[in-house]
Regions:
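Outer-membrane beta-barrel transmembrane domain signature
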Residues: 27, 34-41, 46-148, 158-161
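Short glycine/proline- and aromatic-enriched beta-strand/turn motifs that initiate or cap beta-hairpins
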Residues: 1-34, 158
Length: 161
């Protein structure tokens, strides 16, 4: 579950999270990811993820995202708290041009670039973890749109099976 920020830039959420303003727009996402490769003696995995999201509050539409990228697993405290960090990159398709993106950016498109950064923590031998994710849609510096996009901070749960 995430809440959409009114911050213009994703890095504003990372550098000053306590000063972030949020709009009354939320995002609920269900995702399936699959690891397809491991490197560096298992320290890095590569995964692909598909997401179905529903935006509600000040906007109401569905969002479909597909992304792939690396996940880092080698943290020195993993014996106490299993930790991983991921960066995934792909595409995001909204079922309509998001109203909040229009309000915040002046324009947007249904199809935009999608990326996320995630940190997940859980018990050392457990198959579940809690995740904190920055969910980002953007025009990709004019590749898909000159304006548009959004940032959402999301808290979630991951289950391995």
């Amino acid at each position: 579950m995430g809440r959409i920020s009114s911050a213009n830039a994703w890095h504003d959420l990372l550098t000053s999270p306590g000063q972030a303003d949020f709009v009354d727009a939320y995002l609920a996402v269900a995702a399936l990811s699959r690891e397809f490769a491991r490197q560096r003696e298992g320290d890095v995995s590569w995964e692909v993820e598909g997401q179905v999201g529903y935006n509600f509050g000040d906007q109401s539409h569905w969002e479909f995202n597909g992304a792939f990228g690396p996940r880092w697993h080698a943290f020195p405290w993993n014996g106490s708290v299993k930790t991983s960090a991921a960066f995934l990159f792909g595409l995001s398709m909204a079922t309509e041009v998001p109203e909040v993106e229009l309000e915040l950016e002046g324009d947007s498109e249904k199809l935009l670039i999608y990326w996320c950064m995630e940190v997940a923590v859980g018990p050392p031998r457990g198959e579940w973890s809690v995740s904190l994710r920055l969910h980002h849609r953007s025009g990709g510096f004019g590749l898909f749109a000159d304006d548009g996009g959004m940032n959402a901070l999301a808290l979630g749960a991951r289950f391995g099976f």
